[in-house]
Every structure is written in structure tokens, then in C-alpha cells.
Amino acid sequence: MINRSSSDLILVGATGRLGNSILKNNEVTFGISSKKNILVGKKIDHLLNPLLGSLKDVSIKELKTPILIDASFPENFESIYDFCFHNKVPLVLASTGHNDTQINKLKELSKIIPILHAPNLSRGIAFFKAKILNPLVDDFEKYLSKVSSKIDVSIKIIETHHNKKKDSPSGTAIELRNYILNRISQETDIQIKSVRDDSSIGKHEVIFNFGKEEILVSHNALSRDIFGEGARLSIFLKSKNPSIYSMEDFLEEEN
């Protein structure tokens, strides 16, 4: 079912895999693609205006409550940064693979506008982190302090995606690793293994190894619709102060 948003959504990367999922599940005012795309200038499903080839073509003055969703690639970050900075437009950064310089600029931008940093727009991943990983990591930390001198203890993440995915490891895997490391006081190295196949949408497994036994928890995306549906949480940006937010923040607010 299409979400009739009370905000004017601007979608960069409207014709990609993630962009298609967002379009399928949300009403989008302006969609942006590459200037070379043969669909530029044409009307496509769930897009209120013809597809544009640049953010410079967006009629920003016509929009009352614009929110920009980036579902493209890091190569577009500078133009997205400039657009959001100059127009004070809230940003949903759903693209992945950004370098340290870009992440630092994102942090600076968050002093001016609210930003939802969502390498994965799935509500399930947000639930997985907050309700499953978080308590598990807390208990792991306590256990680690007792047994680390007696047995080899380690954590590993395995991420599996389709072979058209550009970045490796996935942004979600990196986010999961950082999420865990930020909650463990002892120095721990978390290895990430990337697997590519013909059809996987996105599977992430976190393995806690205790020498002769291990505990595995995982999240598996079965449909791309979950990303488009998760993008609906962007409406909560309208009422937020400048800062960087996560899907977990908005998942709690939705409930």
C-alpha cells in the first residue's frame, strides 16, 4: 500500500533497486536519477513529477516540508550535502560506502539539519539491533570478563548479498560491527566475511564463538519492500532537532 506522506519526499537514486522499493511504497514528489538515464523527463509510477536528472532541477520553493532520501551512491554525496546545507532540508542517508571525509562532513551537516543515517532501512534490522543484539552483547561482555583468559572468544559477522552490490563489506555489516564494539569495553576484533551470490537481498549473521561452541543470531531480508516501508519512518525527521538519528530511534517513536 502506498504511503501518502505529509512531507514532500525528494528521492535521489529513484531508479535503482533501493529507489524502486521506496517508490513502490511511498508517494514521492521529486525523483532524481543520472542525467544519462533514458527515463529522465518522463513520468514513472508513484512519482508526482517527471523524473529529474539533477537536484538543481528541484523546485524547492514549491515544497512545504521537504525531506531528501539518498538511495544512490557516495559519488552523489557532495551535491546532496550542498542541497541540504543551503536549503536546510532534512536528510535520510540510506546509501552506503562513504569515506571518512564524507562521514565527517555528515557530522558537520548534522549541526544544521536532522539526519537519519540508515545504511539499512529495514525495521527488522533496527529491532534486531535494539532488542536482540543489545542484550546479548551486554551478557557477552559480562561473560567475556570471566572466561577470556581461559578460552578463545571471538565475534564474526557474515553478510550475504547479490553480486551486483557495489560495496563490500555491506554498510549494515559495518554498522553492526560498530554497534557491538561500542558496547564492549575489552579490546575485541570483529571479522566481517562477505559472500556474493545471484539472488540474496541481504542476510546478516552475527556469530559469538566460545572455542568449542558458538551462538548465531541473524536477520534475513526476504523482500525489498521492507526498505521502502522502513523509509516511511522519515516523517519523524520533521519534528527533530539537528543531530544524527538511527532507525532504532524512530522505531521506538513509532511504537
Language-model region placement:
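Conserved strand-to-helix beginnings and helix N-cap segments that scaffold or border functional pockets
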Residues: 78, 103, 128-130, 169-173, ...
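Thr-Gly-centered strand-to-loop micro-motif
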Residues: 68, 93, 118, 193-195, ...
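Short glycine/proline-enriched coil/turn segments at helix->beta-strand junctions
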Residues: 24-29, 64, 87-89, 111-112
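C-terminal substrate-binding/catalytic lobe of Rossmann-fold NAD(P)-dependent oxidoreductases
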Residues: 2-59, 141-255
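Rossmann-fold NAD(P) dinucleotide-binding segment
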Residues: 58-94, 103-105
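Rossmann-fold NAD(P)-binding glycine/threonine-rich loop
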Residues: 75, 82, 95-118, 123-126, ...
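Proline-centered loop/turn at the N-terminus of a beta-strand
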Residues: 8, 90-92, 114-116
